[in-house]
Amino acid sequence: MKTVTLATCNLNQWAMDFKGNLERIIESINIAKSKGAKYRLGPELEICGYGCEDHFLEQDTMLHCWQSLAVILKDPELTKDILVDVGMPVLHKDVRYNCRVILLNQKIYLIQPKKAMAMDGNYREGRWFTPWIKPRVVETFYLPRIISQITGQDECQIGDAIISTLDTAISSETCEELFTPNSPHIQMGLDGVEIFTNGSGSHHQLRKLDTRVDLIRSATSKSGGIYLYSNQQGCDGSRLYYDGSCMIMINGDCVSQGSQFSLVDIEVITATVDLEDVRSVRASFMARCAQANLTKEFPRVRCPIQLTHIDYCHPPDRVIHINYNTPAEEIGFGPACWLWDYLRRSGLSGYFLPLSGGADSAATAAIIGIMCQLVILDVSKGNKQVLKDAQRITNSPEDYIPTDSREFASRLFFTAYLGSKNSSKETRDRAMEIAKDIGSVHKEVDIDDISQSFNDAFSQITKKQPQFRAHGGTPRENLALQNVQARTRMVLSYHLASLLLWEQGRPGSLLVLGSANCDESLRGYMTKYDCSSADINPIGGMSKIDLRSFIEWAGKFRDMKSILSVLTATPTAELEPITENYTQSDEIDMGMTYEELSIFGKLRKVNRCGPVSMFERLVADWAHLEPSVVAEKVKRFFYYYAINRHKLTTLTPSYHAEGYSPDDNRYDHRQFLYNSKWDVQFETIDKIVLRLSQRPQLKNTVNCPNQASLTQQ
């Protein structure tokens, strides 16, 4: 038995926070050493933070990274008898690389650049970094003076190499490289690498952890090996939440797993594993042995350290079951942790939410409620950083210990029902009950006088008085009167956020929360610069369908029963007068259901469908509808998407949660001025509809894969 103890971690790094990032790195190294680990792995670009974006182009960023590394190397205890693997950008021959830097006993042994850049979805690493495309090549890297004065080294090696210790071989692949078809671990495993490490900067997306785990399991189950995975965790300054989930696997089995969602800044996990288990699996797999025999050798960098324990007092850790959260739990915990990080790092004193009594604002309020519950839980576990942040945010004395989530919410969460004569008693009462259930300080405000002042100003200018549709007005008048109410709410929300703490005699101001869902943004069913315009939006990347499942879960399992009432309510903007014969409905106004919108959104972004390919897909999936009806639905969606696309350019920064997000910032790049007629696209759809109408026999066979087998029976 040859056991080794290895450590990996989740770190809540913050882009460009060099002081805080360094403190967390140092603490993680100390924790790893205290647990007896001989190898410590950290997240991708952990010294500066993964989300620096165009700050990577600044030489200052490089300077501060080397300064931080110098602090680590200067302390003789930090790297004594432990391999420390840190992530940082490195400039080599005036080319910028995303690198792993391997330290031991105050020396740098290897700088290993990333070979494959993440360039899809939210990632654009190729904008800042160049991949190392020289397989099995190492070069001389000349160390900056700030480092050589400490290490006594003028140079070290940089490139595609393997670390050889006295008893095993180690190499790394970084984040995206795990997801590529020809991952580095394949060839390196065949060349004798037994321990693979992956310092990652992987953000949360619903159900993404399943993919990550499957890839790590596959990396070690096919031909044996030990795999360490590290990740950032938290909001590092943007729309993304890095969801941790550090883990250690051996031969396809998990032996240690960290949290996916947490308020803890530093989480270090370790596992003791037996190298002989890897060697036994590999040596008995003869097909693998034959391929290994043909593998071209990698350069090796020798490190004078023995990782294995010299006694029999360190038995291997047992296999554990991997913990997964349900999608509803992910919607609750991910944005809640993101909101806490955003609040504590913003320097502000709480959140303000316009609470309408509808599903979207109820879901947003519930996420704040869960955030408060997580704070209480962490404080009860002795998390000193969370307690310190809670006291500072709420301007509470040092002896204040939050023990009740509703009481804590009352110190930092403010809501208001911004009603009008078009609002119903049901939504007003519902908003009050939800606020009470969560614990917010709740206000009720009527906006009629404010909105009317705009209409009066218009009448004074034009000598005309616009009317609602219900009172004989034209569609233009009706829309303008709705929009002025919506925009009034936005201005009033910011005014309240600025002064509600002043009303209580407390310092600070509040962040304004938006609560527009992904579907409505995509359809453009919102007023530009209304309550959808806010500081941040925790639900802007989620569909109404996903939010409804979250509301059901939160109502049943997070002690928020009042929000369940929104599930049976008809979604309505309540911007038009309610009459005996008319009550405004979102789905009627939009001309499509939320279920349909969710499908359109996924096909448009995830499946990359234009109008024609979307119609071809749906005419099969919706075989119960006439092709002409499907065509009309698809055309209507793309028409409204085109005329409202400009609204997406001003969307409030939203938590990224799903692949169907319409986020205009860097995820869904498209023009914002369209020909809404879609002449060629719609003509092509019409031709397909005509062909289908001339072949009616196809109607009964579309989307019936089991029809042949049923006929045979």
From Swiss-Prot:
Pathway assignment: Cofactor biosynthesis; NAD(+) biosynthesis; NAD(+) from deamido-NAD(+) (L-Gln route): step 1/1
PROSITE patterns for this protein: CN_HYDROLASE
Single GO MF descriptor: ATP binding
CDD domains (alphabetical): GAT_Gln-NAD-synth, NAD_synthase
Region (Ligase): 324-703
Pfam families registered for this protein in UniProt: CN_hydrolase (PF00795), NAD_synthase (PF02540)
HAMAP family: NadE_glutamine_dep
Protein name: Glutamine-dependent NAD(+) synthetase
Protein source organism: Dictyostelium discoideum
